[in-house]
Swiss-Prot record:
This is Malate dehydrogenase, cytoplasmic. Its EC number is 1.1.1.37, 1.1.1.96. It comes from Bos taurus (Bovine). GO terms for biological process: malate metabolic process; malate-aspartate shuttle; NADH metabolic process; NADP metabolic process; oxaloacetate metabolic process; tricarboxylic acid cycle. Homodimer.
Amino acid sequence: MSEPIRVLVTGAAGQIAYSLLYSIGNGSVFGKDQPIILVLLDITPMMGVLDGVLMELQDCALPLLKDVIATDKEEIAFKDLDVAILVGSMPRRDGMERKDLLKANVKIFKCQGAALDKYAKKSVKVIVVGNPANTNCLTASKSAPSIPKENFSCLTRLDHNRAKAQIALKLGVTSDDVKNVIIWGNHSSTQYPDVNHAKVKLQGKEVGVYEALKDDSWLKGEFITTVQQRGAAVIKARKLSSAMSAAKAICDHVRDIWFGTPEGEFVSMGIISDGNSYGIPDDLLYSFPVTIKDKTWKVVEGLPINDFSREKMDLTAKELAEEKETAFEFLASA
């Protein structure tokens, strides 16, 4: 057995965490021979609920779970971390402007970034889930100057999985048969789900998605809006935001960081845009197609970008630049 790793989940009394914690504890994310010390952080009013979650994790009697720590104190939560999954954020309330949401979250992620900087291992991998995820991730990274910015990523894997699922449903195959879809940009309704480079396995051979579907107007229209608005559709139907699918996407994202991506396959994640070859401005936290090896991501280079894609990629970059500007004004005054 290897040494236990310390894994933090914030917002640990919430819906997403409730769907996520069992998968982390049972070896689905870090492997079946990796012991784990699981650290659960939430705000003080949630500590009663968190106690219940702690009891349930104990009652799961998971052999890999060496310890579970529930706390509302950052100096305990962020100590010596190997992995931080930042799920907790201020949710958007009715009538709340996106700007107000940004302001509340800048405060949270500035504090958590500073706590990572002060207490966590410098090799910590930080995954931001709480919305607005891209800008929250950038805020945390800026507030943790001693941790390499490449160690920070935000979740667009849920959008990626949603795109795969839509293509699979349309073609009557399983999601497994679809690969190399891309989510460009922000985890918001401006994201651009791109299947120009995606492949699908049909009758044992790989075909381009455009060629397989022969329905360009669906791919350039309804498909894109369905993926962009899927989160809102789930809320409308379930009266709660996506939790099971979000937790599954977090597992996929973190597992790929840990073990790498399969040969010939790429995935989507929000990462720092510095030095990219797709004309996206530097210093944005933008979702790109990446491959991962030895816990290090690399942007997939050289994919041809048509005019339709270019426009969509620039639009979501513009939104991210505006969010960043607003967040940094708050950051300066926070």
